């Protein structure tokens, strides 16, 4: 499951650029123009509607804290509209400018890379404790920081993760209702469709987002309700099996993932601690659970590139012993990968294992989105770092020590990367050691 980190700071008031919207024939995104059509505007409005009604499950009188980049303003304005129509008492939006973030790397003093605006993230955490919902709009440039010093990037990520942790803990424990949705942006579109003109690339990316988010359907809310029921049924089936481990086999992969004691499989929406039902990731095609942090053995190879905090990591290959990564390689971004797993001890261990059929709509699109929210829903994946306590029986009532005793991992990070394909087989291992097929050639057995 994608758990969006706080954006690298570069906050503006939303007036740093003129962004025309609504009655005009074109929307000016940060760089370049995208031609609107009535059909596009209708789908954009549907996306905003399902983000609020289905993704967030917003309650009457609830506040909303939203984060996004400047490029996402055409979508965020519609989300704000639907949030107020749904009864929001206040919507507060924090907009970040990616180009401002780059200026920090080019002109900021060395000490700045160990700093993060704790006051801002503490305020977000306080808002969540006071009952606010959280909505993140993703669409960042996958390679924004690819040319910057990996050591500085790592320091910024660590400082941000530490400062954001009080808020992130409320999110990973599902104490609040939250969701992540996507907005096509020029930089992201160029990365996905490098050979197309900018306007065509944006149109193609928007089309893919609408389809994956079911905003291209006449009644997207009903479509999501049906899809959500299917994911819950799959999770129920896996919970009934009570596997003690999963065994992944495929090219470059022979990995046994032990599952945490009293683990639960989840999929689709969930009821947060505040009683609101939400779908945290839009889109979502996964069912997932918590591995045992000390019971992972073998080696595994990534099947898709990972876009991590503005840098690309490709062809990841790691080896686990007693749950811990003891060897890690990558054909590109190896230094970034190494620094990521050195964030803390938990960064070398798994916090999530997820099953996704190769025939999922996102995989069937044939696109490499270079965005974890989408790519993780095209393939089975694992996540390094923080576990979700909700994937344990009564996990939301357990102390940190009790969670650890059951095998749940603890870390500043939670980074998903893809290991599934149409050449991956997955077996379920029972407590007695018996094995049975769960997936064959990337599909449910």
Regions found by a protein language model. Give the residues of each.
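Short, glycine-/Ser/Thr-/acidic-enriched flexible segments
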Residues: 71-72, 140-142, 185, 253, ...
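Extended hydrophobic packing segments that form well-structured cores
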Residues: 401-445
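Residue-identity detector for glycine
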Residues: 10, 14-16, 22
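Active-site lining segments that contact anionic ligands and/or coordinate catalytic metals
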Residues: 295-297, 313-315, 322-325, 348-352, ...
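Active-site bordering "gate/hinge" segments
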Residues: 21-297, 437, 444
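Long, well-ordered mid-to-C-terminal structural blocks that present hydrophobic/aromatic surfaces
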Residues: 287-343
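Dual-mode signal for accessory low-complexity, basic/Gly-rich regions
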Residues: 327-396
């Amino acid at each position: 499951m994608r758990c969006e980190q706080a954006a690298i700071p570069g906050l503006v008031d939303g007036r740093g650029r003129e962004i025309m919207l609504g009655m005009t024939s074109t929307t000016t995104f940060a760089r370049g123009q995208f031609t609107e059509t009535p059909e596009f505007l209708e789908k954009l409005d549907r996306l905003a509607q399902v983000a609020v009604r289905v993704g967030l499950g917003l309650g009457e009188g609830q506040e909303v804290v939203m984060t996004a980049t400047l490029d996402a303003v055409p979508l965020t304005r519609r989300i704000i509209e639907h949030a107020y129509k749904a009864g929001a008492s206040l919507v507060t939006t924090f907009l970040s400018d990616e180009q401002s973030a780059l200026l920090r790397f080019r002109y900021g003093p060395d000490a700045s890379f160990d700093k993060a605006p704790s006051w801002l993230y503490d305020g977000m955490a306080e808002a969540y404790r006071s009952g606010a919902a959280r909505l993140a709009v993703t669409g960042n440039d996958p390679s924004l920081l690819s040319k910057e010093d990996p050591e500085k990037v790592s320091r910024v990520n660590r400082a941000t993760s530490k400062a954001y942790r009080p808020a992130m803990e409320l999110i990973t424990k599902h104490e609040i209702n939250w969701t992540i949705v996507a907005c096509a942006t020029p930089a992201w579109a160029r990365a996905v469709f490098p050979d197309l003109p900018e306007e065509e690339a944006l149109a193609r990316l928007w089309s893919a987002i609408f389809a994956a988010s079911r905003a291209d359907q006449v009644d997207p809310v009903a479509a999501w309700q049906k899809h959500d029921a299917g994911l819950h049924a799959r999770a129920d089936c896996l919970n009934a099996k009570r596997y003690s481990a999963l065994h992944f086999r495929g090219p470059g992969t022979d990995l046994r993932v032990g599952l945490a004691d009293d683990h639960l499989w989840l999929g689709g929406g969930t009821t947060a601690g505040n009683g609101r039902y939400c779908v945290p990731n839009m889109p979502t095609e996964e069912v997932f659970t918590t591995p045992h942090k000390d019971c992972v053995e073998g080696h595994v190879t990534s099947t898709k590139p990972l876009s991590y905090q503005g840098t690309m990591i490709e062809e990841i290959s790691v080896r686990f012993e007693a749950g811990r990564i003891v060897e890690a390689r990558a054909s590109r971004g190896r230094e970034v990968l190494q620094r990521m797993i050195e964030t803390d001890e938990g960064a070398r261990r798994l916090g999530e294992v997820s099953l996704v059929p190769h025939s999922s709509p996102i995989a069937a699109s044939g696109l490499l989105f270079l965005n974890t929210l989408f790519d993780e829903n095209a393939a089975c994946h694992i996540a390094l770092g923080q576990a979700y306590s909700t994937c344990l029986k009564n996990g939301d009532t357990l102390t940190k020590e009790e969670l650890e005793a059951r095998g749940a991992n603890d870390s500043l990070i939670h980074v998903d990367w893809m290991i599934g394909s149409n050449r991956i087989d997955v077996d379920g291992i029972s407590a007695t050691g018996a094995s049975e097929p769960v997936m064959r050639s990337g599909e449910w057995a």
